[in-house]
Amino acid sequence: MHQLTIAGKAYRSRLLVGTGKYKDFAETRAAIDASGAEIVTVAIRRTNIGQDASQPNLLDAIPPSKFTILPNTAGCYTADDAVRTLRLARELLDGHPLCKLEVLGDPTNLFPNMPETLKAAETLVKEGFQVMVYCADDPIQCKMLEEIGCVAVMPLASLIGSGMGIVNPWNLRLIIDNAKVPIIVDAGVGTASDAAIAMELGCDGVLMNTAIAHAKDPILMASAMKKGVEAGREAFLAGRMARKYYSADPSSPTSGLIGS
């Protein structure tokens, strides 16, 4: 299968994972290993990656030499906060430009604030960041983010942490069909079938955290998500049969029947 390419770098895995909500860093690493993910996103405002030398450092468990670290701006509600957070992340990661931008609008549902997201994206791209951006599943705004220069656009499947799966597949198809950068579903995936559906629609990848971390067995769920993403991608490439309503088509041959 073709590899996922983001900002000129190719990845074998199309599953991207988060690092929050696990019981400890050991479980985090075990789940990531089971998922096969190569890109791992980290909430800079909530996770220590060197800001506090007195606390355990996530990068000791998930070294940048093995994984692509994707700092994100979870918890930011303005463009200015998001930009400041990613400037700090770039310093902590020795100039690493790849980042995940998210600017939230409502703390009760974590839906993105799109005007602030667009504003932050413009600033970050001008400053040389390679921006992967969490956004609403609005085809027009997704195209605007692409045209600003974002290296990947990441529309939500449903609300962050909801586990509701793909609630608007038609918008996702519109976004995918019009895109010239990778489209990665971000947020709302609850189980492996959700991940498979996203990939069958033609998404280039899926990012998740809660679906794995809050499973009864996170390690097993991480493995299931890996398989779901792979199966969905293969099904997309294979091309599903056409739906035929009220038009029977026997799966067994109809010619050369015995006695005919």
UniProtKB/Swiss-Prot annotation:
The record's Gene Ontology cellular component field reads: cytoplasm
Q: Which reaction does it catalyse?
A: [ThiS sulfur-carrier protein]-C-terminal-Gly-aminoethanethioate + 2-iminoacetate + 1-deoxy-D-xylulose 5-phosphate = [ThiS sulfur-carrier protein]-C-terminal Gly-Gly + 2-[(2R,5Z)-2-carboxy-4-methylthiazol-5(2H)-ylidene]ethyl phosphate + 2 H2O + H(+)
Q: Which GO terms describe its biological process?
A: thiamine diphosphate biosynthetic process
Query: What general EC class does the enzyme of this chain belong to?
Result: transferase
The UniProt record lists the keyword Transferase: yes
SUPFAM superfamilies assigned: ThiG-like
Specify which residues bind 1-deoxy-D-xylulose 5-phosphate according to the UniProt entry for this protein: G161, A187, G188, N209, T210
Catalytic residues at K100
Lineage at the top is:
Bacteria, Pseudomonadati, Pseudomonadota, Betaproteobacteria, Rhodocyclales
Q: Which Gene3D superfamilies match?
A: Aldolase class I
InterPro entries (alphabetical): Aldolase_TIM, Thiazole_synthase_ThiG, ThiG
Q: How does it assemble?
A: Homotetramer. Forms heterodimers with either ThiH or ThiS.
Quote the Pfam families the UniProt record gives: ThiG
Which gene does this sequence derive from? thiG
Q: Give the similarity note.
A: Belongs to the ThiG family.
Arranged from A to Z, the UniProt key words for this protein are: Cytoplasm, Schiff base, Thiamine biosynthesis, Transferase
Q: Which organism is it from?
A: Dechloromonas aromatica (strain RCB)
E.C. code:
2.8.1.10
Which Gene Ontology molecular function entries are recorded, alphabetically? thiazole synthase activity
So which domain of life are we looking at?
A: Bacteria
Annotated metabolic or biological route of this protein: Cofactor biosynthesis; thiamine diphosphate biosynthesis
The record's annotation in PANTHER family points to: THIAZOLE SYNTHASE (PTHR34266:SF2)
HAMAP family documented for this protein: ThiG
Name of protein: Thiazole synthase
Compartment list: Cytoplasm
The entry's function note states: Catalyzes the rearrangement of 1-deoxy-D-xylulose 5-phosphate (DXP) to produce the thiazole phosphate moiety of thiamine. Sulfur is provided by the thiocarboxylate moiety of the carrier protein ThiS. In vitro, sulfur can be provided by H(2)S.
